[in-house]
Amino acid sequence: MDGVKVETFIKSEENRAMPLIGGGSASGGTPLPGGGVGMGAGASATLSVELCLVCGDRASGRHYGAISCEGCKGFFKRSIRKQLGYQCRGAMNCEVTKHHRNRCQFCRLQKCLASGMRSDSVQHERKPIVDRKEGIIAAAGSSSTSGGGNGSSTYLSGKSGYQQGRGKGHSVKAESAATPPVHSAPATAFNLNENIFPMGLNFAELTQTLMFATQQQQQQQQQHQQSGSYSPDIPKADPEDDEDDSMDNSSTLCLQLLANSASNNNSQHLNFNAGEVPTALPTTSTMGLIQSSLDMRVIHKGLQILQPIQNQLERNGNLSVKPECDSEAEDSGTEDAVDAELEHMELDFECGGNRSGGSDFAINEAVFEQDLLTDVQCAFHVQPPTLVHSYLNIHYVCETGSRIIFLTIHTLRKVPVFEQLEAHTQVKLLRGVWPALMAIALAQCQGQLSVPTIIGQFIQSTRQLADIDKIEPLKISKMANLTRTLHDFVQELQSLDVTDMEFGLLRLILLFNPTLLQQRKERSLRGYVRRVQLYALSSLRRQGGIGGGEERFNVLVARLLPLSSLDAEAMEELFFANLVGQMQMDALIPFILMTSNTSGL
């Protein structure tokens, strides 16, 4: 009996020294297969056993921030320390249970992270990850407030400091992936379809990426301002273009950083190398997916602009074309004569090479003592090309555009205030406003031409280019906006019943634009151009008094404002794509001026 008592006493002492399992009491007991703990003979209560949040096996305690078993603890530790990357052969929703946890290591690691296991706890079990996230965001915020060129360096230095504190081989991506709460149920926490932030990023990564993109953009703007201050002689670009470029650069930088984070946090390949996060290039597939989605959005918006116009043209499809369009009479052969003369003409883009620049320009006051235009100079009669089958509409548009631009320049050369200018000044003014002049001519001769056919061909050409993958989406958007602007402008002037004299004055107001002459040596020439523009405005005001007073004048001038946004490249693409080829309209304008003199147009 004494030996039995001693043996019983030793066993009770050993059980007292063992760690409690499942919240058992300090009294002796033996674990039972059912999951409970057998208490003493007098105890009737049975305490429940905690289960692993990952696989559902019996948990041995809280490991790396989550209640888990020894198997999942060891698996998570090996994956983090060895920086292992897994791939799922299924749909990334494999079952992770006690008996099937070894089938898919990828889904098992994902469920470990979703259950609350922290990768930084593998190295530093007593330092929570929340403090480090706040430290990284605070470091990035301090670098943004400091400004200057050290914004990105402060961000990177702060990031490297935290990496050194964690030790080698630690991963920011694996660290920030453990976002769900610890006490959430496994079925609710592990749901791959509930991604709040884009591309699988969490709040900390998204905040860091956007903040770093802002810092980089501010740094680029400061460098651009500093470089611009040292070169005052360089002509500055349009402020609106600079603003658009900066917005595009900022968007591109932000997309690249987001793609870096997405590629490093790819759900199919976990990357635990934190040193490659700020310098790794985005994968081709990720950047291609982002860029293609943005391109489709731009193209879709551009095509949406054209849809109401196309619907209106279809409703008005019964509009009859003027008899001139159906006649089989050939044109006068003016363009053929021009082409024949261009073959024997020396290519002189400066129109005689007179480069006085307006510094010694003498104003002839006699032109201001008479009317700017006469009824003959305001008349605009274009001979329309033959309108045949619908599949030849593109040739109709090209031929119409060429006749309009030739007739516009020929009409302007008869105006005395335009004849006073030197040849290179005439070219400079025409190059700046020729898209707006074509819009004026299209609205003036809408009774002679089939304007619905032209607008309909613009819509068809834009839709055809939208189906080509190599065409830039911005080009599609410009063409769609230009089509809408031309359509609205023609419709508005048609409702106002504008006279030929008013059309001629509007043409002079657009052409004599002093903002096109910004060089210092063109000061006297700029004053002359401003006087002509003011004289044309006063003449238009008097014309408006005849037809409707001050209100009509204000309406006509307001209709000119959208014409300043017409894009020259888009206008060339819509009107002259099949006619001039690779030669731009800026290069053709000097030839048209010379041929209008030599051929007697």
Curated annotation (Swiss-Prot):
A zinc finger (NR C4-type) spans 52-72, 88-107. It comes from the Eukaryota. Pfam families: Hormone_recep, zf-C4. Residues 215-226 have a biased composition (Low complexity). Induction: By 20-hydroxyecdysone (20HE) 106 hours after egg laying. Signal peptide: none annotated. Residues 49-124 bind DNA. It is found in: Nucleus. Residues 329-596 form the NR LBD domain. Keywords: DNA-binding, Metal-binding, Nucleus, Phosphoprotein, Receptor, Transcription, Transcription regulation, Zinc, Zinc-finger. Belongs to the nuclear hormone receptor family. NR2 subfamily. PANTHER family: NUCLEAR HORMONE RECEPTOR. This is Nuclear hormone receptor HR78. It comes from Drosophila melanogaster (Fruit fly). The lineage of its organism: Eukaryota, Metazoa, Ecdysozoa, Arthropoda, Hexapoda.
